[in-house]
Amino acid sequence: MIVDEPTGQYYYGSQVAAPIIGNILSEVLPYLDIAMNDENVVKSFTVPDYRGTPVDQASYAIKNLKSNTIRCIVRGNGDTVIDQMPRVGTTVQDGGVIILYTEENASKSTVEMRNFNGMSAKEALAWCERNNINLVMEGIFNKEFENCRAVSQSVEAGKKAEQGSAVTVSFIYKEEIQ
């Protein structure tokens, strides 16, 4: 959908196009037999800045996020968060991880990024969870993790990635592959 030369005081997409898209989706989704509820959406949030926060307060905040599936790993024996991964402003989805560092010399582990090409979202998510990498999934619809395959990724396979960092993987459904 394109809104060409909107008039009036408001001209941003969230104010002009979003209401129209909302109306379209409210009619199209039931036709496609897709329920409109939060259960079908992969939840995500933007990582805040935990640096300078007492580690117990930061880990409590992470464990009590709305999604309740974000894992918190503390590295070091200090009382205050001095660094974090992923960085402030990064998007993290369900099943993700935030690593809090409390000492300058706390180890920052890296992993060799896997080639996700052809993998299902479920397989990619399992690998990322095992390796403490945040997976940002594009193209996933209705939480259907099995019937799709990865076609691209933001971090090249074989490159070193710091644990806690994020990789964006785009998926398409098997019907679209043919």
Q: PLM features: what roles do these ranges have?
A:
Residues 1-178:
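Ligand-recognition elements built from short beta-strands and adjacent flexible loops
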